[in-house]
């Protein structure tokens, strides 16, 4: 499922009725850049905010599984969908949704992924390259979810994404073009694998750099182009 092509959806801003103050400011045009919301630490409570500010966002279904849980009346089955969204230019999110039907489960996962959207730091942290362009990640990062642990390493230009299909989908929609990965644990669990990769990308944002280091690494946050 991870190799399914990403899709874009058109969003009608005029038909949208915001429920939050930030949503109303976005519709009125007071806020026109999603990085402003993230830099201020404002909460993303409506997926439509992401649709309005990132019209080039793509969605990719990584996995749909039938899961069961025991109840006093017997086994209850639901579908669990794992989705990644991103614009291939510095923004990415991962989400999961559950429902009795496949369609609603995917829609819930898409909404969850949009609300978990983060800015991604890109750069050139490989000692083999040093070109200073934002094609890889600026430094090594680690992430974990459940039993799965993922380590991302900068790679020189042209290597591509040396990763499993799930991690490759997350990194690709984040805008990372070259990277090496190390994985530990049960990576067959799609959501944990995707979330661990997402966690590693998010951890890049907590590393402090001096201005001269940022220039050397070609470090860029959010949109590159």
From Swiss-Prot:
Residues 57-120 form the S5 DRBM domain. It holds the Pfam family Ribosomal_S5_C. The keyword Ribosomal protein applies. PROSITE patterns: RIBOSOMAL_S5 (PS00585), S5_DSRBD (PS50881). One of its GO terms (cellular component) is cytosolic small ribosomal subunit. The keyword Transmembrane does not apply. GO terms for molecular function: rRNA binding; structural constituent of ribosome. GO terms for biological process: translation. Keywords: Ribonucleoprotein, Ribosomal protein, RNA-binding, rRNA-binding. With S4 and S12 plays an important role in translational accuracy. The N-terminal domain interacts with the head of the 30S subunit; the C-terminal domain interacts with the body and contacts protein S4. The interaction surface between S4 and S5 is involved in control of translational fidelity. Part of the 30S ribosomal subunit. Contacts protein S4. Belongs to the universal ribosomal protein uS5 family. HAMAP family: Ribosomal_uS5_A. This is Small ribosomal subunit protein uS5. The gene is rps5.
């Amino acid at each position: 499922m991870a190799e399914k092509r990403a899709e874009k959806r058109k969003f009608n801003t005029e038909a949208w009725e915001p429920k939050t103050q930030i949503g109303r400011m976005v519709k009125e045009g007071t806020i026109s850049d999603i990085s402003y919301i993230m830099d201020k630490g404002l909460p993303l409570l409506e997926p439509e905010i992401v649709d309005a500010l990132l019209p080039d966002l793509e969605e990719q279904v990584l996995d749909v599984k039938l899961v069961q849980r025991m109840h006093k009346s017997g086994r209850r089955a639901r579908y669990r969908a794992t989705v990644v969204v991103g614009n291939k230019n510095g923004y990415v999110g991962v989400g999961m949704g559950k429902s009795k039907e496949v369609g609603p489960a995917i829609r819930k996962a898409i909404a969850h992924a949009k609300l978990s959207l983060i800015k991604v730091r890109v750069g050139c942290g490989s000692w083999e390259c040093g070109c200073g362009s934002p094609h890889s990640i600026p430094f090594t990062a680690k992430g974990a979810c459940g039993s799965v642990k993922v380590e991302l390493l900068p790679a020189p230009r042209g290597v591509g994404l040396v990763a499993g299909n799930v991690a490759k989908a997350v990194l690709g929609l984040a805008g990372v073009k070259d990277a090496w990965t190390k994985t530990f644990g049960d990576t067959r669990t799609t959501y944990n694998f995707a979330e661990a990769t997402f966690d590693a990308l998010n951890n890049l944002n907590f590393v402090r750099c001096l201005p001269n280091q940022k220039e050397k690494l070609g470090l860029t946050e959010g949109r590159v182009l």
